[in-house]
């Protein structure tokens, strides 16, 4: 009985692992955005989607409009993941969302949901269609 239960659990874990491998960058990022146990902010969640755990501590202070120059934290995280494409990422993000500044995206009546910023930034960093 215990063996059958363990085998079933192992099968479930394998299926989950396979599904995680085929998730898009946006899906990976959104799966950790403001979700327990980590409660990652926008910048952290984009970095985590690419396995960049080395950036998570530094990105703690970059959510909620606190990234340098008031940049959207999700975009800032994407730039940390792919710094060689910083200008390309910024231009594509602006084309999709209308701005790169968090205050312009969120100020007053929010124009773009944080989840959309996270999804777009992750897709762009991965080179996926945003």
Where are these regions (language model features)?
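A short glycine/serine-rich beta->alpha loop
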Residues: 29-37, 61-70, 106-110
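Serine residues within intrinsically disordered or low-complexity segments
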Residues: 5-8, 12
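C-terminal binding/interaction regions
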Residues: 88-130
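Short, positively charged and aromatic/hydrophobic N-terminal segments
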Residues: 18-19
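Helix-rich "cap/lid" substructures immediately adjacent to catalytic or cofactor-binding pockets
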Residues: 35-61
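DPxDG-like acidic metal-binding loop motif
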Residues: 78-84
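Beta-strand segments within the central parallel beta-sheet cores of soluble alpha/beta enzyme folds
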Residues: 55-64, 90-94
């Amino acid at each position: 009985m215990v063996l059958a239960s363990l085998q079933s659990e192992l099968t479930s874990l394998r299926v989950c692992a396979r599904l995680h491998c085929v998730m898009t960058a946006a899906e990976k990022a959104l799966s950790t955005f403001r979700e327990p146990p980590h409660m990652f902010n926008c910048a952290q969640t984009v970095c985590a989607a690419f396995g960049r755990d080395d950036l998570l501590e530094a990105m703690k202070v970059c959510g909620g409009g606190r990234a340098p120059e008031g940049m959207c934290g999700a975009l800032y995280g994407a730039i940390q993941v792919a710094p060689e494409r910083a200008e390309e990422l910024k231009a594509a993000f602006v084309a999709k969302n209308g701005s790169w500044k968090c205050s312009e995206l969120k100020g007053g009546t929010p124009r773009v949901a944080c989840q959309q910023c996270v999804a777009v930034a992750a897709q762009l960093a991965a080179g996926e269609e945003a």
